[in-house]
Design a protein with these regions (language model features):
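Extracytoplasmic/periplasmic domains immediately adjacent to an N-terminal transmembrane anchor
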Residues: 1-155
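Junction motif at the cytosolic side of a transmembrane helix
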Residues: 9, 15, 41-43, 259, ...
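Transmembrane helix boundary and interhelical loop/hinge segments in multi-pass membrane proteins
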Residues: 15, 172-194
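Transmembrane helix segments
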Residues: 33-44, 260-300
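Transmembrane helix-loop junction
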Residues: 37-38, 177, 181, 224-225, ...
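Membrane-interfacial helix-loop-helix junctions in multi-pass membrane proteins
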Residues: 148-152, 281-338, 346-347
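Long, hydrophobic alpha-helical segments
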Residues: 155-177
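Alpha-helical transmembrane segments and their short interhelical loops
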Residues: 198-271, 275-278, 320-326, 330-341
Length: 352
């Protein structure tokens, strides 16, 4: 135990050999989240409406104010403006007579087709309320049946899905850099001659990587909680879910460092693996919402399984098959541990 403690202390001292990498690994995901949260889609859209003197125009604005989630925020924030009929930044609605009929014309600026769809759908929802009032018994009633008891903003999901990537990124790139540096600085010989067993050496390094990765994820978790007001139901369960993810990532970093023996290539393995896995692993939405092919591919990554397990902690509702996800994470972590042990024995003995 004393030998393991000395190895662990030495692992943390290695922070001084790659300070920029450690800072990037620990803080970059949180900084990215805070920047992205400022531009991510918000359910309430500011929609500009040209001031209308007609009763119908005022009725449309009133209907727009009624459009919203039955359990959360409104979908439209109508803003009355004096439109000159020419310049449009995003969109503006002008109510006027065309062909003898009162018409609401939605003018668009330079925006993408997805934003056009969002603006159009909100205007249609407001118009439907006007039609229903006129149609009486023939009205088309549209009811939203929420799955959850309250609306959860997308920034919560984005931050939640970023937690596995945060832990993975920190463990993988730190493990890759530290291990590759052992070869670049020639200190790998010390491990070859050391009386400590492979289990102690790898155990100390993985413990350090796991703790560092959990700290990085913890910083992001606090940032998500402070900015959204949403906190997980159980912090220790979140840590348990992320634990096998950090082990898998740490082993990937160690393998990259052992096999490549160069800092930059090993670092790129961890970096690319983290971002590709995050994108393919439900990073922007639940895998089932992107088609069967994407869902099948995403289940090959630890990110989707971790995200599905984290979902219950943030939303209070379970999705997927939790037992299968836990099994996948544990088996993958075990396989990676075995491969890392074999690679370490082969590479260190060969170096000696």
């Amino acid at each position: 135990m004393a030998r393991f403690r000395l190895l662990l202390v030495n692992e943390f001292k290695l922070f001084r050999t790659a300070i920029p990498i450690h800072l990037v690994a620990i803080f970059q995901p949180t900084v990215m989240y805070l920047l992205m949260a400022a531009i991510l889609v918000h359910p309430t859209f500011d929609m500009y409406v040209d001031k209308s003197a007609t009763e119908e125009g005022r009725a449309l604005v009133a209907a727009m104010e009624e459009v919203g989630s039955p359990i959360g925020l409104p979908y439209i924030n109508p803003i009355l403006v004096d439109w000159d009929g020419e310049s449009v930044s995003r969109q503006v609605i002008a109510v006027g007579e065309q062909g003898g009929a009162l018409t609401a014309v939605q003018h668009y600026g330079l925006i993408d087709s997805n934003l056009v769809k969002n603006f159009r759908n909100r205007l249609t929802a407001a118009a439907l309320r006007l039609w229903d009032a006129e149609l009486g018994s023939r009205a088309v009633t549209v009811e939203e049946s929420p799955w959850l008891p309250r609306d959860v903003p997308y920034t919560v999901y984005f931050g939640m899905a970023l937690l596995p990537m945060t832990a993975f990124l920190a463990a993988s790139i730190m493990g890759a850099i530290l291990t590759a540096q052992e070869f670049e600085f020639g200190t790998i010989v010390e491990y070859t001659l050391a009386p400590a067993s492979v289990v102690l050496v790898l155990g100390a390094r993985l413990t350090r990587l796991v703790l560092s990765a959990l700290i990085s994820a913890g910083i992001l978790l606090v940032a998500v909680g402070l900015t959204t007001g949403f906190w997980p139901g159980s912090l220790w369960r979140v840590a348990l879910i992320l634990l096998p993810v950090t082990v898998i990532a740490g082993c990937l970093g160690l393998l990259a460092g052992l096999l490549m023996r160069r800092s930059i290539p090993a670092f790129l393995v961890g970096l690319v693996g983290s971002f590709v896995g995050w994108i393919l692993g439900s990073g922007f939405g639940l895998a089932a919402g992107f088609g069967k092919l994407y869902e099948a591919i995403s289940r090959l990554t630890p990110f989707t399984h971790a995200t599905q397990l984290l979902f219950a902690q943030y939303y209070g509702a379970g999705i997927g098959r939790p037992v299968a996800s836990v099994f996948f994470l544990l088996v993958t972590a075990t396989v990676m541990l075995v491969l890392t042990g074999l690679a370490y024995r082969w590479r260190v003995m060969r170096q000696g």
